[in-house]
Amino acid sequence: MTMADFDWKARFGPIIDELEKDGLEHWATQLQQQLTHRFEDRPHGDLDRWQAALDQLPGLTQIDAQLDQSAVTLTSRQPLTVAQREQLELGLRGLMPWRKGPFDFFGTYIDTEWHSDWKWDRVSPYLSDLSGRRILDVGCGSGYHCWRMLGEGAGRVIGIDPGLLFLFQFFSVKDYLGDVPIDLLPVRMEALPADLETFDTTFSMGVLYHQRSPLDHLLELKGTLRRGGELVLETLVVEGPEGFSLMPEDRYGQMRNVWFLPSCDTLLRWLDRTGFRNARVVDVTPTTTDEQRSTDWMRFNSLQDFLDPNDPSKTVEGYPGPLRATVIAEKP
């Protein structure tokens, strides 16, 4: 197995061609340069191992997908043999840890660290109808929510996330489904051209608090949307008045890259100042150890290890425990 076994040009050639045909030549050119750098100039040392795990997955036919259920579910009208089930398990285990999900591959249930379906259930009642919409999902992880968007009738879904293990987990689903209008690009938000103004809905869930400049992130998100487009923003918040924002001294819940946790009123002010309209908080929910926890598919530390063992309402650093708000707003 060599690095050449991962053919990034074959993987991403179709979406690069599509962007060119859609009049987004500047994005297509920039993306090709970024992917060349990612996979040729500085290839990740685990690419061959992850490709080997994908290659382990059995080839199956007569496949159906249920994308409107809690678990993104693949089924086959052709029953799997014992050997195929063993291959499937080995391949999927080779892509551990699985953090975002859950997924069900032909009866093999992947109980991921996060119950991402709970977040979807909180957000989805407040969304504009996704039917036919072109959607961007920023920080999409392995693409769980992208699949749920497709299940709601989205016309085109593009997820972006720099994590390459997430990319291969995404491939494990897409390779079974073939030509479906969904792609995951292994890039960061700042790698997108400014002012694309091409998406009907842009999601940014669990990203804002990782930004050193949250207002710049909001402006970047606004630039992805067409006029009248919808932003769906989910982030960590704290209780407090308008103008208040918590900046951790160092870590928050053992995470180093957490910068700003605003109050809900502060978050609404940020959206107003960055030019969004009709911003409203639609949900505020504490994250519990039922929603985020270690499992057989993610065996590392999880939320219970990041909370004060004597007071689970606080992080181990003494800050308020994780509280997540979802805000929806429009671009004028």
What are these regions (language model features)?
Residues D200-P214:
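A short SAM/SAH-binding and catalytic strip from SAM-dependent methyltransferases
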